[in-house]
A protein has these predicted regions:
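N-terminal DNA-binding module of tyrosine recombinases/phage integrases
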Residues: 1-53, 57
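Short basic/aromatic active-site micro-motif
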Residues: 46, 135-136, 232-250
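Basic, Lys/Arg- and aromatic-enriched nucleic-acid-binding interface segment
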Residues: 68-71, 75-79, 90, 94-150, ...
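C-terminal catalytic core of tyrosine-transesterase DNA break-rejoin enzymes
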Residues: 90, 141, 145-152, 221-224, ...
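Catalytic-site neighborhood detector that most strongly recognizes the C-terminal catalytic loop/helix
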Residues: 115, 172-176, 186-188, 261-286
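Short, polar N-cap/turn motifs at the start of nucleic acid-interacting alpha helices
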Residues: 160-167, 233, 252-271, 282
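Active-site/catalytic core of tyrosine-dependent DNA strand-transfer enzymes
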Residues: 184-232
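C-terminal secondary-structure termini that scaffold catalytic or DNA-interacting sites
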Residues: 193-197, 207-212, 267, 285-296
């Protein structure tokens, strides 16, 4: 009962965060904000209303980019604190209940869906193939065919690739869960060819030329390829949107798309449902034309 929120946060950063390398910097920064705001509050006095008050303060914060903090970012601050509180309940028995359990997440606007048209895709793939960077074409093909996140594909290791079964297992994922995606056809052929010239001193599929212990940074060749291909308003993450969009337009069920992308819930793939509906509309139209086209 004597522990304060500051005690909890400091212990969490010291003992737990080192095991969460991918979120260490982000979580530490977010938790320190909470410590600055209400770190001296005893855990026994930590209330839902107090946290809500600070959440609303956070939502009015102006960022370094001179913009009000987005609901999504506020929700990440809330998630960091809630995770730490849950750890104190389960593992340390410092608290009996999480006061954040009753607090709703801020409503986030639906994210944009930017995907490549057929013409854009062909231009971009041609530009990547002609790039001075000999690996750019392969990594873009892999991104489009697997829907993997940028770091998942950039940090891919040979130990996570089964060329015989045609399977990639992403182990360094955003939600710390393993995910396997089949690799077939052209992408598998390209990766097989690439495996024949892999470096002996690195398990990384796309290692840096200067330091094989780290992954290659594709930002510059990627930007140049976009310019050459005349593809505008397109980010690397949109390759992931493109993969999901193509799956939806080919009639793949939302649950399957979620599994391929590594989403725990269907809510993150609902943005693609209209594409699936458009595809189904075309299918029904074609079927009706074939069945009834000659009838007056």
């Amino acid at each position: 009962q004597k522990h304060t929120l500051s005690d909890l946060i400091q212990r969490y950063i010291r003992d737990v965060l080192p095991r969460k390398a991918k979120v260490y910097v982000e979580y530490a920064s977010q938790l320190k904000w909470w410590e600055e705001q209400i770190g001296d509050v005893r855990l026994s006095d930590l209330s839902t209303s107090l946290i809500t008050e600070k959440r609303d303060l956070l939502s009015r914060t102006i960022t370094n980019r001179k913009k009000q903090m987005s609901p999504a970012r506020v929700n990440r601050y809330m998630a960091a604190l809630s995770t730490a509180l849950n750890t104190s309940i389960r593992e340390w028995e410092w608290m009996e209940d999480n006061p954040m359990r009753k607090i709703s997440k801020l409503k986030e606007p639906r994210g944009r869906v930017r995907y490549l048209s057929d013409e854009e895709r062909e231009r971009l793939l041609d530009a990547c193939k002609d790039s001075a960077n000999t690996n750019l074409y392969l990594i873009v093909v892999l991104a489009l065919s697997t829907g993997a996140r940028q770091q998942e594909i950039w940090d891919l290791r040979w130990s996570d690739v089964n060329l015989i079964k045609g399977l990639i297992t992403f182990s360094e994922t955003k939600n710390d869960e393993f995910r396997s995606v089949p690799l077939k056809g052209h992408p598998l052929k390209l990766l097989l060819e690439h495996s024949r010239i892999r470096r002996d001193d690195s398990d990384i599929v796309f290692p840096s030329k200067k330091n094989p212990a780290v992954s290659y940074d594709f930002r510059n060749p990627w930007k140049k390829a976009l310019v050459v291909a005349e593809v505008e308003d397109f980010r690397w993450h949109d390759l992931r949107h493109s993969c999901a969009s193509y799956l939806a337009m080919n009639g793949v069920q939302m649950r399957t798309i979620a599994e391929i992308l590594g989403h725990k819930t269907l809510s993150m793939v609902q943005r693609y449902t209209h594409l699936n509906a458009e595809h189904l509309s075309d299918v029904i139209s074609d079927m009706n034309n074939k069945m009834f086209g000659n009838r007056s």
